[in-house]
């Protein structure tokens, strides 16, 4: 399954941990957004890992957007063709 994952984490340290966890499962696209092609069990493993890293009571959030094959082919992009390599951006 193809999943776009975005996150909003206020704490720099937790944000870095979320970034590292996601980097093991997908491609970093921009700041707090990853694209992942995962099997169902990989998704459950990632979701469990992220659930243990975030602090929802401190307004941390992670969103998962599931794209079907047809929808995936309709993704359009303007600019930003270079894929990011590594490293978290802290704003």
What are these regions (language model features)?
Residues 22-28, 50-53, 68-71:
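A broad, low-specificity signal for short, low-complexity segments enriched in glycine/proline
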Residues 53-91:
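C-terminal structural segments of small proteins and small subunits
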């Amino acid at each position: 399954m193809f999943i776009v994952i975005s996150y909003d984490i206020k704490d720099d340290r937790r944000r870095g941990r979320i970034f590292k966890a996601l980097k093991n499962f997908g491609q970093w696209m921009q700041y707090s957004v990853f694209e992942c092609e995962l099997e169902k069990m990989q998704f459950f493993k990632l979701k469990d890992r992220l659930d243990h890293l975030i602090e929802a009571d401190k307004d941390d959030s992670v969103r998962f957007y599931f794209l079907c094959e047809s929808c995936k082919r309709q993704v359009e992009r303007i600019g930003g063709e270079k894929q990011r390599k590594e490293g978290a951006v802290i704003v």
